[in-house]
Every structure is written in C-alpha cells, then in structure tokens.
Swiss-Prot record:
It is found in: Cell membrane. The lineage of its organism: Bacteria, Bacillati, Bacillota, Bacilli, Bacillales. The gene is cobS. Pathway: Cofactor biosynthesis; adenosylcobalamin biosynthesis; adenosylcobalamin from cob(II)yrinate a,c-diamide: step 7/7. Belongs to the CobS family. GO terms for molecular function: adenosylcobinamide-GDP ribazoletransferase activity; cobalamin 5'-phosphate synthase activity. It is a multi-pass membrane protein. Joins adenosylcobinamide-GDP and alpha-ribazole to generate adenosylcobalamin (Ado-cobalamin). Also synthesizes adenosylcobalamin 5'-phosphate from adenosylcobinamide-GDP and alpha-ribazole 5'-phosphate. This is Adenosylcobinamide-GDP ribazoletransferase.
Length: 261
C-alpha cells in the first residue's frame, strides 16, 4: 500500500503541476507503481476539463471554451509534453542524421520548426474542440474525461513495446521497471477504458473506432521514432501525448461529421 501511494505521488510530481512538496523515495517498487498510475493523472485532468466545460458552457462561446480547455491542459502538465513536442519537431524535421537529431533533442533552444508546429498544434486543437462542442456536445463531455486517461495509458504502451534511443534520459531510466506487474496493469487499464467507453459513449461503432485508434497510434509512433532516432526518449513520449491528443480529436471530429452529414 505504501509503495502504491508513493508511486501515485511520483506520477503526479512527474506529469503534473499538482503541488506535492513531499520528498518521495525512488525505489523499484515505487517506480513500477508510478508507471501504473500515469492514467490516474489523466483521469484527474479529465475531471477538471469536464468540470470547467459544464460550468462555463452556458455562458461562453464554443471558441472561448475550446481555448480555455486547451490552456488548462497545458498548465496542468506545466508544458512538459508541449516541450517534448517542440524538441521533437526541431529534431525530426531537421532532416539530419540520427546522432545530430539526438543532439537537437537535448538542445534547450527553440527552433523555427518548433514554433511553426506548436502554432499549428494549438490552433488545430482549439478548432477541433470548438467543432466537437457544436457537433456532439453530449459525447464531447465524456471524451473530455476519457481522452486524457487514454493518452497517459499510451505512455505505458510505449514503454512496454518500445526501446530507448539512448542509454540516458527518461525512457531509458523507466524501461527497467516495466515488469509483468506493469504489463498486467496496462491490460486492466485497457479493460477499464473499454468499459467506460461503452458505458459513457453508448455508441458501439464510435467506441470500437476509439479503442482501435488508442492502440494503433502509440505503435505507429514507436515505428516513427525508431526510424528517426533509433527508439524513444522522454521528448518523444511527451510529443506522443500532444500529437496523440490532436489525432484522437481529429478522428472523433471526422466520425461525428460523417454521422451528421
């Protein structure tokens, strides 16, 4: 129980800006539990997003609501995932060799590719959320809860099936703790997500499409990372959350647009 609680606190310290000042011991068991608890940090974010949406939707336009939801997501993670997105954009779009791309990933400076892709990322997120608010307000409410959970679960999927691009960094430090315990917990999380989707969305085709996409995206992203830099890193994992969110909202928008057309 103690190790589980420590793992939960470590997960929130690492992935969120929730003010946890307590010094948590980093042990093998607490590290494993931390990985298992990643989706819980998404569940809390989902709860905050749903609360904000329900509270302000009677008073604000879809555009302002969408902008506030995106802003809350960024501040909740402290811009951690967005930083990964920017680093990966500069590295992957540089068209350099693998070693140079790894150097660019470690460079704290922001390049032109990072600026351009971040503007596009945030702009398209706001646009898609605004569209979904208008197209399917009921389903959108539940997707706000489910998507952050799925994105953090996809971190576990990448740790299970991927390999580190280098011997240093976040990904390399976490891989030794991806044990059978973590893999079994990942399966339990997927069953929970699947059950919640069927229960809340009440649409079999939508649910099956959603579940298929949250499986395919991390596996596809791992292939991209392997081709570009030989594996994954902390930055690529962060980028997968940002890119994965845009991908899921895009798929959901396409689905509802085709249904209402």
């Amino acid at each position: 129980m103690k190790h589980g609680l420590n793992g939960l606190l470590l997960a929130f310290q690492f992935l969120t800006t929730v003010p946890i000042t307590r010094q948590i011991p980093w042990t093998a068991r607490s590290a494993r539990w931390s990985i298992v608890c990643y989706p819980l940090t998404g569940l809390v974010l989902g709860g905050l997003l749903v609360s904000l949406y329900l509270l302000l939707s009677p008073f604000l336009s879809p555009l302002v609501l969408a902008a506030l939801l995106v802003t809350l997501s960024i501040f909740y993670s402290g811009g951690l995932h967005l930083d990964g997105w920017m680093d990966v954009s500069d590295a992957f779009l540089s068209r350099r060799d693998r070693e140079t791309k790894l150097i660019i990933l470690k460079d704290s400076r922001v390049g032109a590719f990072a600026v351009m892709t971040t503007i596009l990322l945030i702009g398209w997120k706001v646009l898609l959320l605004m569209e979904l608010i208008a197209l399917a307000p009921r389903e959108f409410t539940w997707l706000l809860l489910l998507v952050p959970v799925c994105l953090r679960w996809m971190i576990i999927v990448q740790l299970i099936y991927g390999k580190a691009a280098s011997d240093q960094g976040m990904a390399a430090s976490l891989l030794p703790y991806v044990t059978t315990h973590v893999k079994n917990a990942s399966r339990v999380w997927f069953l929970f997500i699947a059950g919640a989707c069927f229960l809340l969305l009440q649409n079999v085709i939508l649910t099956l499409c959603f579940l298929l996409m949250i499986w395919l995206f991390p596996l596809f992203w791992l292939r991209v990372c392997k081709r570009e830099i030989g594996g994954m890193s902390g930055d690529t994992i962060g980028a997968s959350i940002e890119g994965g969110e845009l991908f899921l909202w895009g798929i959901m928008w396409t689905f509802f647009l085709s249904v209402t057309a």
